Amino acid sequence: MYASNKTYPSSRALPCLVEKVEAQHVDGAIRVRITTLEQKDWRQAKAAAVEAKYEAEREIQLRAHGNVKDIEITRESAFEHFATDPWAQHVGVDIEAQRERLLAEPGSRKILIIGAGFGGLLFAVRLIQTGRFTAEDITMIDSAAGFGGTWYWNRYPGLMCDTESYIYMPLLEETGYMPRNKYASGNEIREHAERIAQTYGLATRAMFRTVVEKLDWNEAEKVWTVAGSMLGIANNGQRDNMMSFQMVSQFTIMASGSFASPRVPDYPNIFDYKGKLFHTARWDYNYTGGSVENPKMLGLADKTVAIIGTGASAVQIVPQLAKYSNKLIVFQRTPAAVDARNNCPTDPVWWETETQAEGTGWQKRRQENFNAFTCNEKPLPSVNKVDDGWTRMPSFSILIGGPQGLDPDYVDRMRAVDMNRQEKIRARAHNIVQSEGSADLLTPWYPGWCKRPCFHDDYLSAFNLPNVELVDIRHNGISHFTANGLVANDIEYELDVIILSTGYTVPVTRASPSSRANIAVSGRNGTTMEAKWANGLATLHGVMTRDLPNLFFAGTSQAGACVNLVYALDQNATHVAYILANAFDRRPSDSARVIIEPTPGSEEAWAMQVLQRAAGFRGIAGCTPGYLNGYGMDASSLSPEQQINAARLAAWGEGIASYVRYLEAWRAKGDLNGIELTFFAKF
């Protein structure tokens, strides 16, 4: 027999990397000759096999994804509770009295901020820090009953942030707060939002449980007319006893996040289900038992529990459900790519030494060090300060942009780097999960940037527990619901409770701020924000656009994007605060109103800059369906004009550092170049 002394690493679910096998009879025996590939050829063949597996997986999911619509939860009485606020009665604030007091303030609001999460808070704080504005100049509005945005709504068991707390939790330097762990719990993050509000006098400046529905520019008065509804507080914050309201504001800032409204897929016969049904973003501790502070879900001890979806939220929830449920069934379409998190308590000695040694501005420098690694800057800093799974994933720059993104071979280079990382992720699943079948199902076959990477130390091992079952629905999906459960793969599962971990109603394309917030925005001459986004977007720096004067917004379209969303929001806030403060300084008198908007030429020039860099995101094509790529939307089906309009909606393709440098250089000139200022004397 012919034998080779070479050994080759195994690769599950991949073809054997052998070039030729020959067999012949010699002297009554069978002699086999195996011709193996050389190392370079082996790597190429392996890469081709992985790419083929990626494409096959994508095709399976595109066929299975189908056309499942979403239920409009505010219009279906059976699902109204998905839109309610289960925490409204526990905030310790007289929300109705505070709303009435703020509404009774005479005259127009100077600055209205829509959203009281970290985005809204950062806009408010950076405005106050200019010295031109005070907290009394600011009114904040949010549909929640407290500060925190997505961290207000999400209180499910196991909730944590997968971005390091020292860079994610804003204004640590200003508030003097030390996070308890490297990765903070949702509870701690929400408390920090409240701390910021208290520190800057904003706690009494918010109209909670209030929804803005319309913004209309009054050209004669040079103000925004704001119309909406004040929601009920009783009955767990249901949308009862709504009262309409109207106010006017000189300036409006839209800081609504993208993760507020739960996504409820309209599965066939979902209305027939008689058991308990809720969404992870509206966790029902009354049913499960436990609380936010102590999530011992003893109410599930005799229950068969299903969770649909295995994204970032489910990765954190599944280990907790597995611990307390009699039976847990996890319905999975796309497996998460789960790396280690390695959380640890903050060492006070290290904290004191680190912050003192770094001095003023330490948090911003740490954030930017993190950005350099995740955007794959060249050259990289000599020290990786955060040094975690994110900073060891340069391929994620395909999704958020980076300075090398326009290199012709960049996507190919990142595919090679990412393939090694994903191979380790796949090996990790097989090393931890004992069942070969479950391990195969939990193995991700897609580039790492196609889904949000996850980091958790207990998720995969939860599938080793005898009370946990994994159901693969990527081929056929969920067929329909029944009175007692649901049907998948022609099997009916009887369930006491179904938990939807199906994400949020994020539009499938880079939607306008008005679409994300469900607000109708109409500017000068009836120009709508929706039309601006649909018909060839042009902005100045991604924060303002012509014919919507005195209106500012946060987002990624024509602005910088990064893993650490809070850093990007802070750059938006710092920039807008500078513009507003400098515009106010130029008023001919204190009583004069200022109207701010970009010139047509400046916003079109900025759009062209964005277009020139949009090719940096070309690696997103070919991903498995998900909200990051419009659930598999095929750009080739668009007309050339539609493709250009879509490219105008992209983020700044050179990465967040390039974007910030551009803004800082623009501010350093001090001339508000590209902005048209007019002044209006109000008598």
UniProtKB/Swiss-Prot annotation:
GO terms for cellular component: membrane. FAD binds at T150, W151, Y152, W153, D162, T163, Y168. Glycans are attached at N5, N286, N525, N572. It is a single-pass membrane protein. Its main location: membrane. Its cofactor is FAD. Disruption phenotype: Impairs the synthesis of austinol and dehydroaustinol. The record marks R452 as: Transition state stabilizer. One of its GO terms (biological process) is dehydroaustinol biosynthetic process. Its EC number is 1.14.13.-. The chain crosses the membrane at residues 111-131. NADP(+) binds at M160, C161, D162, T310, G311, A312, S313, A314, V315, Q316, R333, T334. FAD-binding monooxygenase; part of the gene cluster A that mediates the biosynthesis of austinol and dehydroaustinol, two fungal meroterpenoids. The first step of the pathway is the synthesis of 3,5-dimethylorsellinic acid by the polyketide synthase ausA. 3,5-dimethylorsellinic acid is then prenylated by the polyprenyl transferase ausN. Further epoxidation by the FAD-dependent monooxygenase ausM and cyclization by the probable terpene cyclase ausL lead to the formation of protoaustinoid A. PANTHER family: FAD-BINDING MONOOXYGENASE AUSB-RELATED, L-ORNITHINE N(5)-MONOOXYGENASE-RELATED. This is FAD-binding monooxygenase ausC. It comes from Emericella nidulans (strain FGSC A4 / ATCC 38163 / CBS 112.46 / NRRL 194 / M139) (Aspergillus nidulans). The lineage of its organism: Eukaryota, Fungi, Dikarya, Ascomycota, Pezizomycotina.
